[in-house]
Amino acid sequence: LRMNFFKHIFLGFIFTAITLTVNNYVFAQETDVSSRQIDEIIVTSRKTEENIQDVPIAVYAVDEKALDDFRPTTMRDLDSLAPNLQVGMNTASGNQGAIFVRGCGYAEVEKTQNPPVGLIVDGLFLGTNTGTLLDAFDWSKIQVNSGPQGVVYGKNTSCGNVVVERNKPSKDFEVDTEVSIGNYEAYELGLILNIPINDKVSSRWNFRKLAHQGYYDNLFTEQDSGQLDIAAASARFLIEATENTEIYIVTDYYYDRGDTAPVSYSGNPFGAGCVPNFGAGLGLVGAADNGCTPGLGAVTATELSTAGAAIGITPFAAFAGLEPFFSQTEALPPHVVNLDNPEQSDMDFIRGSIEIVSDTLIGEVTIATSYLQLDDNVLQDFDATPGIAGGQGNPATLGGPLHTARNQHFSQFSQEIRVSNDITDKLNLTTGIFLWKDSIMLQQHSGGVVQTSGQDTESVAIFALVKYDVTDD
C-alpha cells in the first residue's frame, strides 16, 4: 500500500510538471501573439496617434481584423464587446441607442441632453443618441475611452466615448461585395467601391441594406411585427492638396423604415376583471372577497362603476360588467404581441464633414467642420392591448389607448480648430477651440393632444492638453 501511495504521488508530480510546462508554453505563445497585436494598435484618445500601451487612460480598441472575425451588423452588436461597454436599444425608437460605459450612460428619448457616452464617427461627434445604432460596415477600428472625456473628446461626455473609424480612400482600385440571407426573410447587402480619381484624389463609396420581416407575431393584425429596414450610403474623399496638407471629406445618408421595439402585455397584475382603484379619493373601498390581488387596493370594474354612478362620473359608470375586458392575467408568450396601433420608426439622417490637416511652422493644424440633420417620426402602442376591438384592455389605462406619436427635427453644426506642437522632444502641447450649435423641434401627439416644444443651444469650449515624457522610454 505504501509503494502504491508513493507511486501515485510520483505520477502526480510528473503529471503536474508536464501540465505546467505545457501551460507555460501555451501562455507564452499567447502572450507573444497578444503583445504583437497590441503593438500594432494605434489610438487617438488624446487627439494624437499613439500606441495603445502608451496612453495613460482606460482605453480599449478593436482593430479591423478582429472586426472582420466578429462581423457586427450594427452598433447594437458591439454590446459587451469591450469591457464595461453596453449597447442597448431604446424601446421608444428603433434606431435610438442606449450606450453605457462602466454603468454610466443615457437611455432616454429626449434630444435636449447630449448623451454622456459620446459616439464619434470619422471625427464627427453625434449630439443625440437617435441614429447611433449605425450599420457596422467598412469599419477599420473601434476605440472605447472610459470617461470623463469632455475636455478632449466630445461635448459633455462625462461617461466616456466610442470612437468609430471607417476605412479611408486609398490609391488602389477596389470592389468588395457582401450578401447574406437568413430566416425571417432576413438579408444583408453591402457594396464597397474604392476609386482613385487621380494622383492626389481618392474616393470610397459604400452602400448597405439590412432588412428582416420581424421576429414577433401580432395577434391583432395577424402579421409580423418588429421588422428591420435600414439603408445607408456613404461617399468619402481623401485629397492630398500639398505635401503637407491633407483634406478628408465625408458625406453620409441613413434611413430607417423599420418598426419600434414591440411592447408585449405582461398580464393584469390586479387580478382577473380588476382595475386600479381610481375611486379611492371618492371613498371607494373594494369588497374583501372581490377576487382582486391583495395589497394593491384594486377593485372590480363593476365596483368602480358603482362608485362613478353614485356621484355621477360618467366615465367610471360605464365600467359596469366589463370584468371580461380585464380578464387576462397571464403574460403573452415570448415574441407574441397584441397591438392595434402601427409600430413605426422612420428616420432620415444626413451628415457632412470636412477635415483639413496641415503641417505648419507652428505644428500640426487641424480644422474640422461638420453638419448633421436628423428627422424622425415614431409611432408606438404603449398600452400593448387591442382595446375594445380586440376584447382586451390594459387596466393601467382603464382599457383606453396609450398611443404616442413623436415628430422630431434635430440639426447640429460644429467647428473645431486644433494645433498640436512638439515643443521639445519630451513636451507636446495640444490646444484648440470647439464651437457647437444645435437646434431641436419636437411635436408630441398623445391622447389627441398636440404639444410642440423646441430648444436652441450654442456653446464654445477652449481646451489644452500638455503631454510630457518623464523618461526616455
Report each predicted region and the residues it spans:
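Transmembrane beta-barrel domains of outer membrane proteins
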Residues: 78, 145, 165, 178, ...
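Outer-membrane beta-barrel domain signature, strongest for Gram-negative TonB-dependent receptors
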Residues: 222, 228-429, 438
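Transmembrane beta-barrel outer-membrane domains
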Residues: 36, 92, 132, 155, ...
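Acidic, small-polar-rich N-terminal luminal/periplasmic segments of exported/outer-membrane proteins
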Residues: 36-172
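Outer-membrane beta-barrel translocator/receptor signature
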Residues: 114-116, 128, 137-146, 151-218, ...
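Short coil turns and loop connectors of transmembrane beta-barrels in diderm outer membranes
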Residues: 24, 171, 199-200, 211, ...
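N-terminal Sec signal peptide and the immediately downstream disordered periplasmic leader
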Residues: 1-70, 76-80, 194, 243, ...
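Transmembrane beta-barrel strands of outer-membrane/channel proteins
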Residues: 177-181, 205-211, 249-253, 369-371, ...
